[in-house]
A protein has these predicted regions:
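Phosphate-binding site of ATP-dependent enzymes
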Residues: 209-234
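ATP-binding N-terminal substructure of ATP-dependent carboxylate-amine bond-forming enzymes
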Residues: 8-144, 148-150, 154, 161, ...
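Phosphate/pyrophosphate-binding betaalpha-module
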Residues: 165-173, 198
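Structured loop/turn residues at beta-strand edges in well-structured enzyme cores
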Residues: 108, 164, 191
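ATP-grasp fold ATP-binding core
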Residues: 159-160, 187-208, 229-234
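Basic phosphate/pyrophosphate-binding loop/patch that engages nucleotide-derived ligands
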Residues: 158-166, 223
Length: 234
């Protein structure tokens, strides 16, 4: 009996950790996430058993059992073995629920979630909050830190309130586009050219623009606002 217990404990200790790797996402950074996912999935140590979960641009969650090579160019979505899935919110039954076409479902136990999503829905605390609700550990920032750091407008306010220096900037709300002359004056009254504008909550360089004069600044403001209701100028 003691030998059986010892072997059982050894088996549990040697069991691979199963990590759900989320990639893709319904954001402007979808393509960048695919390349990140390929890099992560190809580099995980053998002690880790990954479950690849892709999220389409439309927001559909799919369990993907195919080759990681197909993730890079987006062809993974056409794999016939893909099936719908969702993270179980049940803390007593932690895992990924695979939904088969005929309505049947199975649950795959997971130990943690690794979101390699970029931008909206991925780095803004929403996925992290879902995992918190499900009682699953998340690799990376917790939901509060993710939400704060993803919004540069709010992050700068928090840092400034903590007496941490931030680069001089001006933020605008989309409603200020109704008076473009005033919006430009608000920025140029504080900043000198060249001026950069960007959405406050997009990752990478999505919506980022450089302006050398007021005419270019007007176009930059419009371009940045096409991605988010708040922009920041520096």
């Amino acid at each position: 009996v003691l030998l059986h217990i010892k072997n059982e404990r050894r088996g549990r200790a040697m069991a691979k950790k199963r990590i759900a790797v989320l990639f893709g996402g319904a954001s402007a950074d979808h393509a960048a996430s695919l390349h990140t996912a390929y890099s992560v999935l190809s580099s995980l140590p053998k002690e880790i058993e990954p479950l690849a979960i892709g999220i389409t641009r439309a927001g559909r969650w799919l369990f993907y059992p195919g080759s990681y090579e197909n993730i890079k160019d987006g062809s993974w979505e056409q794999d016939s073995d893909c099936c719908s899935c969702v993270i179980s919110p049940d803390m007593t039954n932690k895992g990924v629920i695979k939904i088969i076409s005929d309505g049947e479902s199975t649950i795959h136990r997971i130990d943690a979630v690794f979101p390699v999503l970029h931008g909206k829905y991925g780095e803004d605390g929403r996925v992290q909050g879902l995992c918190k609700l499900a009682g699953l550990p998340v690799i990376g920032n917790d939901f509060a830190a993710a939400a704060l750091c993803n919004d540069r407008r709010i992050m700068d306010l928090v840092l400034s309130d903590s007496n941490i220096k931030v680069i001089e900037n001006v933020t605008l709300h989309r409603s200020e586009m109704n008076d473009m002359t005033a919006a430009i004056k608000k920025i140029t009254g504080k900043l000198s050219f060249p001026i950069y504008t960007a959405p406050t909550s997009c990752s990478t360089s999505v919506g980022a623009c450089r302006a050398e004069n007021e005419k270019e600044l007007e176009e930059a403001i419009k371009a940045s606002f096409s991605h988010h209701p708040y922009i920041i100028a520096e």
